[in-house]
C-alpha cells in the first residue's frame, strides 16, 4: 500500500514510522527544508502522559475575563476577522462544563497513556536518543484553591491507573532541589512519576533518519497546494503544480489542516493556539530543574534537557500570527527567575513561537474521514509531543485494518460532523 503523508512534524514522522513498520510504502512531503521546523521545533519538551488536560475546563470562562486585565495571563484572545475563530471559541466554551471536561480528559488520557507505552517500546527497539529523561513532572500549586481544584484531575488519573503523589510544600524540594533557591511559596504539588521529558525536534529528526533507513521517502521544500477528489475518494494531491497519487493519504499539517480540508466540504474545528518558549543555556546545574516543573498559575512548563532549560507555555488565540511578542518573553523570564534564579543565562536564550493545532474539546482528531482513502492525524494542541507515538501507532493499525489497542470512541472527525456533512463533497461540474 502506497501512503502519502502531508506534514513532517512529530505527528507526520511518527505516522510514517509506524506505517513503514507495517509494510507500507511511505512518502512524506513538507514545505520546510527538514523535519520538525515548525510547531515541533521548540515546544515545552514535556511528555505529559499523566498531566493531560483540555484547556476547556470548568471555571475557564470566568478566568479568561480576569486574564484580560493581567500582565502575565496564561491565555489571551486577540479577535480577528476570521469567523472560524469565533466558531472555535464558541465550541470551546460549550466544552467548559464539568461533564464535558470529564469526557474529554478521559479521551485524552486514553491516548496519552497509550503513547507512553509506544514511546517506551520505540526507545527499547531503536535506542533513539533525544536528551530524554524519565524523572516525572511536578505540578506546582501556589494557592490552596489550585490544590483543591486538582481533585477532579486526580479522580481521572486514579480511574486510568496513572500513578501520582501529592506533595506537601516541604516535600517538593526532594524531587526538584533547585526550587529551594527561589523565593516562591507553594501550597503543595502533584507529582506524576511516569512523565518524561525530551527535545521534540531532536526526536523527530532522528526518527526521520531511522524511517529513511526503513524505506520512507522524505521530500522537503515542496508546497502542498490542494487535495483532488472524485467519487468519495482522494484522487491526488497537487504539490508544486503537479498531481501526486497514492493509495491512501494522511493529513498531518497541524493548524493548517483545516484550510486544506475546506475544498472537500469538511469543516474541521482545529484552530492555532500560539505558544512561546525560551531555550536557556544552563550555567548552574544545581539551580536548574531536574525534570519538568509545571507552574499552575501561569500554565508554564520548565523542562531540563542536557545542558539547556526549555521554558514554554501560554496560549494566544490570534490566528496565524507568528510575530514574537516581547511581553510573552517577559512572562517566561519572570517565571524562571521566580522558580530557578541563576540556573540559566537568560541573555543567551532563544525566543521562539509556534502554532499548536487545537480542537475545542482538547482531544486530537485521529482516524478515518468521509473520504474512504483519507485519514487525519492532527489537533493535538499542546500535547502533540506527548501523544505522537500513540497517535501514529493507532493510525497505522486503523489504516492496516487491524483492531487498535485502545478504544476508538471519540477520537476521529465524525464527532464533529453532522449527518449531512458526512457525505463527501461533490466538485462543481
Swiss-Prot record:
UniProt: FAD binding residues: 3-17
Domain of life assignment: Bacteria
Keywords associated with the record: FAD, Flavoprotein, Oxidoreductase
Keyword flag rRNA processing: no
EC identifiers of the protein: 1.4.99.-
InterPro entries the UniProt entry points to: DadA, FAD-dep_OxRdtase, FAD/NAD-bd_sf
SUPFAM superfamilies: FAD-linked reductases, C-terminal domain, FAD/NAD(P)-binding domain
Record field: catalytic activity: a D-alpha-amino acid + A + H2O = a 2-oxocarboxylate + AH2 + NH4(+)
A biological process term (GO) from this entry: D-alanine catabolic process
Cofactor section: FAD
One term of GO molecular function: D-amino-acid dehydrogenase activity
Gene Ontology cellular component list: cytoplasm; plasma membrane
Transmembrane segments: none
Coiled coil: none
Family under the similarity heading: Belongs to the DadA oxidoreductase family.
Reported function: Oxidative deamination of D-amino acids.
Family annotation (PANTHER family): D-AMINO ACID DEHYDROGENASE, SARCOSINE DEHYDROGENASE-RELATED
Name listed for the protein in its UniProt record: D-amino acid dehydrogenase
Organism classification: Bacteria, Pseudomonadati, Pseudomonadota, Gammaproteobacteria, Lysobacterales
